[in-house]
């Protein structure tokens, strides 16, 4: 559930229309830090999980498809009111993701990385941390419950990309064609409103 999986369902339709072949999307849930390994091992064709550009990652990069930011999610009853209040607090973020990098920029914060968002939010719910640093789209999903709220300020602004195995430029060209079509479509506007 989320922006990325819903967008990929649109891509499935776009690819089928464009190539006259019926594409069937198969989504695999995995830890963020395993996605590139799965790409390199030909276990998956593309990775889509809020990837931000990093030249150290040896993959093919699509055009950006979504602007986003890293934000702090806190328990509803927290007295944290701004990003400045995160100083010296215990923060949790996804290992290897930009949220972890953003958390490490907070002065004197004690930062822990966990493998997936569900573990992060469960730990926050259990009051093991003062705040979770996550992607804005993820945060919006979790603050729908009465359990959490989100700080208004972002810690980091970014662009999201789709990745493919290094050398798989054909797949990236297909993704870029879909991204262009998506960004010009009503589908994009609907998903932005939804998430």
Task: Report the location of each language-model feature.
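Short helix-initiation/N-cap motifs at beta->coil->alpha
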Residues: 22-37, 78, 112-126, 158
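Beta->alpha turn/N-cap motifs
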Residues: 28-33, 42-54, 76, 94-98, ...
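Flexible hinge/capping segments at coil-to-helix
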Residues: 74-91
């Amino acid at each position: 559930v989320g922006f990325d999986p819903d967008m990929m369902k649109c891509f499935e339709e776009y690819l089928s229309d464009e190539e006259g072949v019926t594409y069937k999307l198969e989504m695999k849930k995995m830890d963020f830090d395993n996605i590139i390994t799965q790409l390199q091992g030909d276990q998956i064709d593309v990775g889509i999980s809020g990837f931000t550009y990093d030249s150290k990652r040896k993959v093919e990069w699509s055009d950006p498809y979504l602007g986003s930011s890293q934000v702090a999610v806190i328990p509803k009853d927290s007295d944290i009111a701004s990003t400045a209040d995160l100083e010296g607090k215990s923060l949790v973020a996804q290992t290897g993701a930009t949220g972890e990098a953003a958390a490490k920029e907070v002065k004197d914060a004690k930062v822990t990385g966990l493998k997936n968002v569900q573990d992060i939010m469960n730990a926050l719910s259990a009051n093991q941390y003062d705040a979770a640093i996550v992607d804005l789209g993820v945060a919006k999903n979790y603050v729908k419950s009465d359990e959490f709220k989100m700080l208004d300020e972002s810690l980091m602004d970014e662009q999201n990309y789709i990745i493919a195995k290094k050398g798989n430029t054909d797949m990236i060209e297909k993704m870029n064609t879909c991204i262009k079509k998506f960004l010009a479509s009503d589908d994009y506007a609907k998903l932005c409103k939804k998430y």
